[in-house]
Amino acid sequence: MEETLKKQKFSVYNIIFIIVVIAQLIFLSVSFAVNNTAHHEDEYFSYGLANSQNRVYLYGSAFQVPDNYNVWMTGDDFKYYIETNEESRFSYDTVWKNQAADTHPPLYYAVLHTICSFFPNQFSWWWAFGINLFCFAVTQVFLYKFFSRFARSQ
C-alpha cells in the first residue's frame, strides 16, 4: 500500500516537473522568437519550398536559374513565392515537386503548407515557429521518458 502511494507521489512529482521544464523551455523559445529582429534565408526558403508554385528557389540558388538575374523582382513576386493563394491551397504536389529538388524530407513542408493553406494571402513567421515549438515540446517529453526508463534499468 505504501509503495503504491510512493509511486503515485513520484509520478505526480514527475508530471509537475515535466510541465515546469517544458513551460520554461517554451517561454525561452517564445521570448527568443519575439525578440528576433532578423530572419535567416532558411526561414524564407521554408515558406518558399512549402508554398511556391513556380520555382523552387526565388533567386536561383543551387540551380542557378538564369531568368531572374539582373531582373527587377517586385514585392508581389516575393509574396507569391512564400504565401498560398486561393488556387494553390492544399496543393501538395508542388510541395513534393519542390522537395524533390531539395535535400530535406517533405513532412515539415507539407505541415507548413497545410497551415498556410488555411490562411491564403497571409503570412506569419509564427506558423513555422509553431511547428518547431510543438516538435520541441514533444521531443522533450520523449527524451524524459527515454532517460527515466534508462535510469531505472541501471
What spans do the regions from the language model cover?
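Interfacial juxtamembrane loops and adjacent helix segments
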Residues: 51-104, 118-119
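Helix-to-loop transition at the C-terminal end of transmembrane segments
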Residues: 27-45, 62-68
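Membrane-helix interface segments
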Residues: 106, 121-126, 150-154
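Membrane-embedded glycan-lipid processing machinery
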Residues: 100, 104, 112-115, 124-134
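Membrane-water interface at transmembrane helix exits
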Residues: 30, 112, 116, 144-152
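Start-transfer (signal-anchor) and selected internal transmembrane alpha helices
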Residues: 1-38, 148-149
